[in-house]
Amino acid sequence: MKDLSEKYALQKQLPAYIKLEENATIFGVWDDHDFGENDAGGSFSKKKESRKLLFDFLDIPKNHPAQEREGAYQSYCFGGGTQKVCLYLLDVRYFKEDYEKNSSPNQRYKKNNGLLLGADQWSWLEKELSTNDATINLFAGGIQLLSAEHPYEKWANFPLAQKRFFDILTKYSIQTPIYLSGDRHIAEVSYQEIKSNYWIYDITSSGLTHSYESLEDEPNQYRISPLLTMLNFGKIEINWEIFELQVQILDADGIPQFTQKISIQ
């Protein structure tokens, strides 16, 4: 944990991050390398210590509800009426069941019938969504929700958990669901109609410091954007006048490389 603590401290000292803190409200949740080990999950022995470091780095108040439970999942809502937005930060690390290695070169891990999010986080999420009245709902988690054909970490490694997430969205008719993911060192936008006239987007952006520039192609039946391998970040803008979202993937110079417009449901 000493190395991780030092990296958090270094990040806080970077002029660009200081400028970001001065000009924006920062919300965050971890992925594996913030958590402590590559592809790590619930069996990681230092997860409680790592959680404290994360919350200290994010300046999460001591009286925040997330401080009272295991894991790092959080929720925030903004605005009201027809202009309400909710953000759900999902923890895909703290409770994740361990993978079983797969001998196939096409899939690194065997499919797992585990919960991925853990029982408590699932209960929290369903309770949150049962009273949700937001017009836009953003869900963020480290691993990709939709892309299923690549060999790395993804929700598709946990098919029952993925189905459960889709079922909860449709059960409560959650409006304009958009999932935000990273992890892959690439950027892409995926889209899936999970039932008739009900869809979800998965916006993947990663990363600002490392990217998989040598990757030429990768199967993803749900991809609706180019496969982008340069350093990148994502941006979402909301136009309430025409009830439309604009999602962009930008390169390290801030130049848009892909734009997707999404009608607010």
Describe each model-derived feature in a short phrase.
Residues M1-Q265:
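Metal-dependent phosphoester/phosphodiester hydrolase catalytic core
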